[in-house]
């Protein structure tokens, strides 16, 4: 039995399971046609066009585009008749720091007994710091190959076991062991241990002076161009001096070619690298050192999450939070004569969906019994910072937050028969998606590329870390249209736009699939809004214990 068929025929079983005691008089197996009709492709396209226009300069926090964007979102929330989501305000200030960090010398030189290797900034390596120090000066730091740089007791894996890395630079592989051996970790599905953010965090906890991740396109799920673009300008972090976690003095990436040359110079064979992908690996000193000097400047400012709500009619203290990040990359490297990274798919598309879903809730015949919150969060591209700040400074109690439904990019390729759930199997939210999809004649499956760690790469993850089930859906693969020529042309036109100036709204967009996905997002939240149940994490989820503690409060 295929996964699609298995999921489709399981609808009745699932509906009879976690959702059977929902104590609602509303027919959960039907669609509110009046609400659905309020979701409109024309108004949606108009908002995407505005948010992704050159006028908004790529919507980077701390820029003119920041001010234009948050004011635009507030104006739309007001025009829709939504209530302010933070007391009398639509804004939640997010204190951040913009860190401009560059090597004093763009040439980084590694020195060893068998020679030296010099590499070029951006072409071969990228480094920076999250430490709030004007200068980072490391006269000499020895390099250690530390496997994946992972400490995971539940998987009996510790790359730092009996290893003192204080003052040293750790070189680590991208992803986690499951990427290479399906019997390890979660096989093809990346765990949080495979994320670059985790590797930086762990190196800091271990006291390393520096950490360099070896880039691999397949393991990272994106090319060196994405790394280069992401690190070529200022980086942002929360201004959190009082509760700052330990950080390495510098962090960054090296290209595959650089790593190969480095290991060759150090006399490290491929066998050693392959052994790092198996249990029992012990870190290997490279007998190579380098020196690092960074000059840093800081800009302290506040960006904003923009928040609105529709108050519930019966259980107003219980909330369902829709999120979409409003920020993108601003103005950056020029590509084909264009330097504005407009971010139409990523994520003007998600913000515009907030407005359409709000319209649907307002048009619903039966009004939501729980409060519906619409939150456009800042600084997702810089490390999920807006949602991280909210989750640590919640306006609505964590233990009364039912779920987070996160919208980050929609596919403009056209309508599909199926829909994907990123992180399928994590929580009972999956069951609501299956039931809602069934109403629209759609099937549900897991994500396209579980090796990318998508579940840990968008704003819902900050809610998940607090024990709140989070939904992150992606478009399906089974396009309904049979016009293969048009589909092929559309795919060709849209290829290569991720984090590029070419991510713009144009005639290649087919809004049919986006509207279908927005309708589904609405129906899932609407179903939850009429129930008394709190969806839980599933037994095999690493977040189940967190969820149980949250609802026990």
Can you annotate each of these PLM segments?
Residues 204, 215, 278, 282-287, ...:
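Active-site-adjacent substrate-binding region
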Residues 123, 240-270, 315, 377-477, ...:
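Metal-dependent peptidase/peptidase-like ectodomains
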Residues 32, 111-115, 125-162, 242-343, ...:
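Soluble metallo-hydrolase cores and metallopeptidase-like ectodomains found primarily
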Residues 36-56, 61-84, 111, 164, ...:
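Catalytic-core environment of secreted peptidases
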Residues 27-31, 38-64, 80, 86, ...:
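N-terminal capping segment at the start of a domain
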Residues 57-182:
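Noncatalytic luminal/extracellular "stalk/propeptide" segments of secretory-pathway proteins
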Residues 15-17:
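C-terminal motif of bacterial Sec signal peptides marking the signal peptidase cleavage site
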Residues 192-194, 198, 218-219, 330, ...:
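Acidic/histidine-rich catalytic neighborhood of metal-dependent amide-processing enzymes
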């Amino acid at each position: 039995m295929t996964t699609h068929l298995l999921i489709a025929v399981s609808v009745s079983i699932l509906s009879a399971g976690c959702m059977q005691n929902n104590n609602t008089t509303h027919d959960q197996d039907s669609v509110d046609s009046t609400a659905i009709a309020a979701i409109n492709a024309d108004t949606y396209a108009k908002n995407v066009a505005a948010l992704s226009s050159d006028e908004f300069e790529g919507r980077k926090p701390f820029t003119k585009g920041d001010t234009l964007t948050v004011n635009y979102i507030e104006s739309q929330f007001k025009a829709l008749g939504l209530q302010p989501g933070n007391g009398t305000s639509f804004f939640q200030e997010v204190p951040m720091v913009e860190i401009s960090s560059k090597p004093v010398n763009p040439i980084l030189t590694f020195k060893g007994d068998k020679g030296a290797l010099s590499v070029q900034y951006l072409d071969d390596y990228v480094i920076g710091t999250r430490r709030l120090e004007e200068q980072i000066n490391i006269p000499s730091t020895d390099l250690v190959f530390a496997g994946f740089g992972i400490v995971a007791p539940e998987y009996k894996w510790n790359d730092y076991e009996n290893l003192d890395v204080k003052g040293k630079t750790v070189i680590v592989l991208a992803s986690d062991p499951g990427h290479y051996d399906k019997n390890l970790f979660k096989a093809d599905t990346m765990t949080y241990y495979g994320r670059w953010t985790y590797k930086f965090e762990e190196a800091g906890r271990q006291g390393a002076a520096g950490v360099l991740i070896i880039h691999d396109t397949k393991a990272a799920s994106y090319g060196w161009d994405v790394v280069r673009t992401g690190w070529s300008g200022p980086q942002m972090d929360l201004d959190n001096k009082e509760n700052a976690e330990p950080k390495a003095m510098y962090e960054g990436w090296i290209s595959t070619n650089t790593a190969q040359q480095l290991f060759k110079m150090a006399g490290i064979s491929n066998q050693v690298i392959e052994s790092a992908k198996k249990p029992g690996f012990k870190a290997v000193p490279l007998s190579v050192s380098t020196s690092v000097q960074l000059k840093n400047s800081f800009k302290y400012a506040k960006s904003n999450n923009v928040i609105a709500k529709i108050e519930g009619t019966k259980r107003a203290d219980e909330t369902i939070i829709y999120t979409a990040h409003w920020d993108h990359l601003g103005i950056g490297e020029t590509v084909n004569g264009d330097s504005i990274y407009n971010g139409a798919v990523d994520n003007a598309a998600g913000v515009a969906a907030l407005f359409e879903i709000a319209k649907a809730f307002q048009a619903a015949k039966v009004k939501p019994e729980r409060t519906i919150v619409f939150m456009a969060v800042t600084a997702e591209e810089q490390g999920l910072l807006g949602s991280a700040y909210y989750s640590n400074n919640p306006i609505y109690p964590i233990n009364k937050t039912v779920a987070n439904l996160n919208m980050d990019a929609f596919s403009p390729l056209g309508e599909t028969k199926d829909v994907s759930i990123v992180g399928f199997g994590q929580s009972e939210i999956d069951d609501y998606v299956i039931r809602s999809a069934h109403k629209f004649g759609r099937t549900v499956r897991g994500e396209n590329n579980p090796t990318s760690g998508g579940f840990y790469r968008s704003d819902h993850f900050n809610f998940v870390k607090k024990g709140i089930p989070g939904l992150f859906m992606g478009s399906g693969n089974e396009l309904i249209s049979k016009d293969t020529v048009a589909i092929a042309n559309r795919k060709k036109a849209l290829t290569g736009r991720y984090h590029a100036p070419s991510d713009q709204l144009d005639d290649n967009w087919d809004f049919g699939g986006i509207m279908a996905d927005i309708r589904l997002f609405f129906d899932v939240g609407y179903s939850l809004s009429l129930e008394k149940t709190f969806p839980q994490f599933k037994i095999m989820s690493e977040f189940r214990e967190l969820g149980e503690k949250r609802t026990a409060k």
